[in-house]
Amino acid sequence: MKLRTRKASQQSSPIQTQRTARAKRKYSEVDDSLPSGGEKPSKNETGLLSSIKKFIKGSTPKEERENPSKRSRIERDIDNNLITSTPRTGEKPDKQLSRVRRKSPVNGEAGSYEMTNQHIKQNGKLEDNPCSGSPPRTTLLGTIFSPVFNFFSPANKNGTSGSDSPGQAVEAEEIVKQLDMEQVDEITTSTTSANGAAYSNQAVQVRPSLNNGLEEAEETVTRDIPPLTAPVAPESGYSSAHAEATYEEDWEVFDPYYFIKHVPPLTEEQLNRKPALPLKTRSTPEFSLVLDLDETLVHCSLNELEDAALTFPVLFQDVIYQVYVRLRPFFREFLERMSQMYEIILFTASKKVYADKLLNILDPKKQLVRHRLFREHCVCVQGNYIKDLNILGRDLSKTIIIDNSPQAFAYQLSNGIPIESWFMDKNDNELLKLIPFLEKLVELNEDVRPHIRDRFRLHDLLPPD
């Protein structure tokens, strides 16, 4: 007996078909329910619900999200406006980086200095960039060189010492004027020192032309004041103003002796300042000679001087200045002879950044000048810097100061020897004329103040009470 076997049907059973259709529908529901923004899918949504949501999304316009999606690094790098150093107050052009090439004074090579948001005028003068988004930097903190002395006005002539806020405003105005002034034509001569030594390999420049006003009024001042190196008769001292002169004219010309007469006394704090110099050693000379720098030993300018003995750069308030220096005739001979019998101390109202660099060039081994004092060691009175010799910590009976501005030693008038201001006279010999008198003071080995008082009679030039 044969049994018949039936082959399995190739068609799927209804149960399997139903299961497959159910699985396909489930997967399609999940795909439709996935949000486009990356949200998590909802498991409980049915096909009908997903269809409704799909219909709603397709019929409503898309709204911009408050927080836009993150952009890729490439997209962020393209937008340069995202990186700013100052608040954006409006649409402004991108900052331009101006590059200035300046000839190096040392080796003749070209050097580049980058200044942002500022245009550079000739020799360090700044011009504001109108496209800048940041406020312009100011350079009104003080001049590099010895500032011009300010006259006591009727409003502040009774001011106390140390009140330097009004003076800073006046000094700021002077800086602006000095940087805009153009110097007169200079006489062209060879760039050699008084003793014939050339400084062709030196380089620098700094010094605002704050002495331009002094140069113009030099003849007027010297006519009113007798020669400083010759004895002055008491009757030829202070002369009153002419009757026809107006009140305003009386205040136009700076009178150093009127300033000295009305200078306020030192405060207790200023009198008790700690000495700025170290104690003397056994090798230190017994007498001290304090020397001014500008217009006494040298003349410096920010304008190019064709007959300059040397020139060098100075960085001051992020601006590079080129300083041109003239050396007074017999400058080196004077220092070499005086350094053998005096403790030479340089005391200047100029900035240290300029004066210290200049002295490093003139006296690199400090064989001539033992100590250096700068503006920070002065006493500020109504914006004027006075050199109080008490800060030296030396015996004032054996201390001498030489300065072209008598008001600079207003507190120790009997210790001061005035000298004519020097700018460019090649025939000047004022330093040589002082050597015999200074040598005699050391030989006498006495209090120098009576001898200085009798020789120069500066007290007789003070105005009457």
UniProtKB/Swiss-Prot annotation:
<dbReference type="GO" id="GO:0030514">
    <property type="term" value="P:negative regulation of BMP signaling pathway"/>
</dbReference>
<feature type="domain" description="FCP1 homology">
    <location>
        <begin position="282"/>
        <end position="441"/>
    </location>
</feature>
<dbReference type="GO" id="GO:0046827">
    <property type="term" value="P:positive regulation of protein export from nucleus"/>
</dbReference>
<dbReference type="InterPro" id="IPR023214">
    <property type="entry name" value="HAD_sf"/>
</dbReference>
<keyword id="KW-0597">Phosphoprotein</keyword>
<dbReference type="GO" id="GO:0006611">
    <property type="term" value="P:protein export from nucleus"/>
</dbReference>
<comment type="similarity">
    <text>Belongs to the CTDSPL2 family.</text>
</comment>
<feature type="modified residue" description="Phosphoserine">
    <location>
        <position position="51"/>
    </location>
</feature>
<dbReference type="Pfam" id="PF03031">
    <property type="entry name" value="NIF"/>
</dbReference>
<dbReference type="GO" id="GO:0005634">
    <property type="term" value="C:nucleus"/>
</dbReference>
<keyword id="KW-0007">Acetylation</keyword>
<dbReference type="GO" id="GO:0004721">
    <property type="term" value="F:phosphoprotein phosphatase activity"/>
</dbReference>
<feature type="modified residue" description="Phosphothreonine">
    <location>
        <position position="86"/>
    </location>
</feature>
<keyword id="KW-0378">Hydrolase</keyword>
<dbReference type="InterPro" id="IPR050365">
    <property type="entry name" value="TIM50"/>
</dbReference>
<dbReference type="InterPro" id="IPR036412">
    <property type="entry name" value="HAD-like_sf"/>
</dbReference>
<dbReference type="GO" id="GO:0008420">
    <property type="term" value="F:RNA polymerase II CTD heptapeptide repeat phosphatase activity"/>
</dbReference>
<feature type="compositionally biased region" description="Polar residues">
    <location>
        <begin position="8"/>
        <end position="20"/>
    </location>
</feature>
<feature type="modified residue" description="Phosphoserine">
    <location>
        <position position="104"/>
    </location>
</feature>
<feature type="modified residue" description="Phosphoserine">
    <location>
        <position position="165"/>
    </location>
</feature>
<feature type="compositionally biased region" description="Basic and acidic residues">
    <location>
        <begin position="60"/>
        <end position="79"/>
    </location>
</feature>
<dbReference type="InterPro" id="IPR004274">
    <property type="entry name" value="FCP1_dom"/>
</dbReference>
<protein>
    <recommendedName>
        <fullName>CTD small phosphatase-like protein 2</fullName>
        <ecNumber>3.1.3.-</ecNumber>
    </recommendedName>
</protein>
<feature type="modified residue" description="Phosphoserine">
    <location>
        <position position="28"/>
    </location>
</feature>
<dbReference type="InterPro" id="IPR011948">
    <property type="entry name" value="Dullard_phosphatase"/>
</dbReference>
<keyword id="KW-0904">Protein phosphatase</keyword>
<feature type="modified residue" description="N6-acetyllysine">
    <location>
        <position position="57"/>
    </location>
</feature>
<feature type="modified residue" description="Phosphoserine">
    <location>
        <position position="134"/>
    </location>
</feature>
<feature type="region of interest" description="Disordered">
    <location>
        <begin position="1"/>
        <end position="133"/>
    </location>
</feature>
<feature type="modified residue" description="Phosphoserine">
    <location>
        <position position="85"/>
    </location>
</feature>
<comment type="function">
    <text>Probable phosphatase.</text>
</comment>
<feature type="modified residue" description="N6-acetyllysine">
    <location>
        <position position="26"/>
    </location>
</feature>
